[in-house]
């Protein structure tokens, strides 16, 4: 897969993100009816729209394929973070993620039109996603709840792995000067792995998020049954 060109990987990532969004939306509407599933599904849908625009780069204006697309990615990841907070029983209010999203949009505007710089854009988007995914990992991993601990570590570990990679990508691109300002023309293992690991994260979330809710629901049923037996 490391030999695939960026555009091909972009289309594959678009497909995996769309499948994740569709799956979570279906579960949210038809099965789960759980409070955390709504932001999970919304976040996956918003991020999926971003990957669609990225895959269409060159066919749509830069305002859509660069600025809007990458802002949607950050907004989608931020919305999923709210879902993770709700799942853990925390308040969903986290203003910092929206300040980060707005700052990312402004920096993308600057490095797209005022001072075109592909490396700077990659640093901005990678750092923003790394920060939010790291926060998601901490929310899921920093819990005393024993229920479905292995699943929480699986999902939290996937977030953490991707956050670490995106942080490395941000740092690496501080020292990389691309030959072309067209992202789809870039090469190198780091840029390729960004898509490969995103596909992996999509599959991890598609499997792990429903299992998290299923485990918590089963535990709640067990607890309710035990309380009922105590009463009688």
Predicted regions and their residues:
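Juxtamembrane segments at transmembrane-helix boundaries
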Residues: 18-38, 46-192, 196-213
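Hydrophobic alpha-helix/TM-entry signal in multi-pass membrane transporters
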Residues: 6-9, 36, 40
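Hydrophobic transmembrane alpha-helical segments in integral membrane proteins
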Residues: 1-19
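Alpha-helical protein-protein interaction elements
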Residues: 3, 32, 154, 220-221
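Heptad-repeat alpha-helical coiled-coil signal-transmission segments
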Residues: 207, 214-217, 221-228
